[in-house]
Amino acid sequence: MKTFKRTLVLLVVCMLPVCMSARTEKETPAYRQKGYAGSVAMTDWLFVFGGLETSHGYMFNEHHYLGGGLGAHFCPIFFPDMIGVFEPFIEYKAYFLKRGSTPTASLRAGYCVASFFHPELDEGTVVYAEGISPFLCPAIGWDWGLKRGRGLSLNVGVQIMTNQMELLLAPKLSFGFCF
């Protein structure tokens, strides 16, 4: 009987690290494991321009993401000459907790490219890019892990741009799907 108890205790002690590591993997969603990660988000920029953004990159561990992407924000009808704003960017995102639900902070850097219609330049309508300006966009938010290695994110930030010697600040809200 003593041998059985000792064997059982030894087995439990040996299996404890395996059980603890399995539990940790369940707490961290699959989209935050080391390797490729991506997201697609609906955004509201300046509370006027609606759009989509996508970011693809590499998760170094469950806390650090580095990637790049493209945003496209479309103009409402009361900006008749403007088509939209396109933003190529690079992004760093920090996840503070190992849990599936965690606060986040991110920083994006890139260029805003505004596209306009100008019918008076040639015959027909001419589309060209104007107003290329660098930007930084710090944001805070929250990520929720879902089943099957997916997640949702909600972020609030401010886009800081420079355009012809002016500093422009624009609030930004995004709701995204992470994979």
Task: Specify the residue positions occupied by each region the protein language model found.
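Short, exposed beta-strand-loop hairpins at the edges of beta-sheets
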Residues: 161-165
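Outer-membrane beta-barrel "beta-signal"
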Residues: 92, 167-179
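Extracellular/luminal ectodomains and secreted, surface-exposed scaffolds of diverse proteins
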Residues: 158-160, 172
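Gram-negative (and chloroplast) outer-membrane scaffold detector with strong preference
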Residues: 42, 55-152, 156
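A generic beta-sheet turn/junction motif
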Residues: 47, 96-100, 179
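Cleavable N-terminal export/targeting peptides
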Residues: 1-32
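Short glycine/proline- and aromatic-enriched beta-strand/turn motifs that initiate or cap beta-hairpins
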Residues: 22-60, 64-70, 178
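Short alpha-helical segments used as structural interaction elements across diverse proteins
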Residues: 2-3, 20, 90, 105, ...
